[in-house]
């Protein structure tokens, strides 16, 4: 850790401590300090965990609240300091002229150059390029806008402080530093007096607003900038023949993901689509307003094109002061039309004033883009390239990137629900009496007949359906209306979770047809929505390629795919596959499924786009996105990748413009490299695959013996983690399980992983791997040879390296001594001790095997930056966990007061902040 980072953390921590003493009193401050220092002693091995338990012995809920808040704020400020440090390191490397680091576009251009990648290969990859970060809701990402604003201001002031500290001192340096410190103290005081979390359970609308906040914080500016920069670089390096469509195309699930969430309705789809459109249209209006002020160029000084003059004449801005300023008059007219468009699409209440009413709304984003390009062309013709390359170029890129929709809203529902809806519709329409009970072949016959027929399935004016069916129909109806209003890019994807058959994929197509998103035309349907199977369980992942092979033999579906650019998108579920089979088995099942899909698509002549349903944690497919994309099989990326982003991961990646740029670059860089370069050095692919398959089977056996076969496991899990509290407190809008059940299978992935993260076991990120590796390696001479094989794979194969690195990262955040405190909450001591012993033994065996294969002495030897980050977080995490255990104990004994409930929620959010990838 550099002096600069250490100084920042101490500086911010000291101010926070002084604010706590001032606001809460000396007693609270001293208890915070005692807990912090005790945590440091535990981290250094100079004290036992019981010493921290004793610090909080008998603590009242009222006194626990400021302590939980204190350590949550410490974590928040430490994150801020680390982000600044990462930013500083990047700037220093650039200033020093160092070789660009991996995951940057500069490094990617060098690699493409060294690999002699030609323009034709680049053009082929970019023709259907799509790098899509898809924002999803998360129960612990409930920070309020006020908190984000405070963080933003503190970050700004810290940058000012750094600039002064690194500059040559002057007579005013100290007074300026004092003023900056005063500003930071003011912001931290405001932060301390602001509630970190909401009182009420967040509504879907709240989660939609949280997602939109990141566009305002960074993505509205940074997505157009990176798309523009990539286009410029590609044109310069590979010529005009390379397609220059926007590469980054954002998406969202918030408001459209109704899988297991009864609160997603037609109203939330409408809210999500309208607020997204309103956000981007108002962004355009602001940019045009600025351009109108900036483009004061006079036609007395330079020439303009006839097209620009025509645009200026249509601008209704003939005031004398602007008679010779055609650009201002042109932009004024364009702004008027965008405001008129906003009024038409969103409502007149969304626009101030009435002056825009003389303008005609734009019929499409393309019409708006043409006007912007008219201005751009005129500037370039008159040699004003520098001016064109500024704000206007970002605006043009924004129009190409966002259209009038901002993001693509995905619809997602599970296959069982679609089947239930169609069963009711078919029965009511007298198509078939009990569709659900038909064989697969019989279902297929019914579905194809319906998809070929233009006849409506729902009689006009009919609304006598069950509540569930009515809700589903409302969602599709509203999605169709949004597409008509904002264009086909608004709702271009329909995802079927738990897809396990051909008919699972065809069923939602009937609903899409019913509401005009697919037009029936015999065996040649037309439509604007990609139908995407989501393979989630180990079994479904293994069967996925076979399902698609059968699907593509159906002329109707194959023709539909052809008119969708011949692209088949497939979503892979990291979360449920992990819950189903454990960390290693899930990772191998996913990789093996991709191998099969790549080969199938190659032989069938279909383009493959993979959508990775990754969570923040390693247990849900998390880890560095750059490494994860490079770890995909050759041919699995092909210029396109979609990835879910959620929770603390969103705030960590996109909370400010600098980190947003860095993370967007990482996604684009990895996509280009994985598509155009061979990043694997494997010499015997089949041997590597056989090894993974054998280890996977052993890992699955160990995992299943605990999670699926141990009779006491469910009790251990539900009673030693905050699962019950996640379900009962106001944490997220979605229920914690798909059904009212206590089985692992029906739990949603986020509560499953979040619960293990909070209790610091992190079980989904490693359990079963140690036993599998030990058993596969064996003993004697065979062991020596097999260890060498695994070491070679670790050095030459990004997939295996990524699996081990991600596992080490999550294991470094586990703390089995804390896990024992959670286990002590279980009434049945026999179950508690037995299951805890199994977990503890497997943890240390897994750590041992990791060190054997990597040649390391510890988990993070090869990642000192992350190791120091984990060490810095340790003192903030321990007090939060100890307080959480005490509050859970009270809650379960019947003290479900608001104070106790709030403390549990505070500690959950604090731990999620400190861990930075908790669920």
Curated annotation (Swiss-Prot):
One GO CC annotation: cytosol
Entry-linked PROSITE patterns: PEPCASE_1 (PS00781), PEPCASE_2 (PS00393)
EC identifiers of the protein: 4.1.1.31
Alphabetized InterPro entries for the sequence: PEP_COase, PEP_COase_bac/pln-type, PEP_COase_Lys_AS, PEPCASE_His_AS, Pyrv/PenolPyrv_kinase-like_dom
Source organism phylogeny: Bacteria, Bacillati, Actinomycetota, Actinomycetes, Mycobacteriales
Catalysed reactions, semicolon-separated: oxaloacetate + phosphate = phosphoenolpyruvate + hydrogencarbonate
Active site per UniProt: 138, 579
Record HAMAP family: PEPcase_type1
Name used for this protein in its record: Phosphoenolpyruvate carboxylase
EC main group: lyase
Cofactor dependency: Mg(2+)
Family: Belongs to the PEPCase type 1 family.
Notes on activation and inhibition: Activity not stimulated by acetyl-CoA in the absence of any allosteric inhibitor, while the corresponding protein from E.coli is strongly stimulated.
Record keywords: Carbon dioxide fixation, Lyase, Magnesium
One biological process term in Gene Ontology: tricarboxylic acid cycle
TM region(s), chain numbering: none
Function of the molecule: Forms oxaloacetate, a four-carbon dicarboxylic acid source for the tricarboxylic acid cycle.
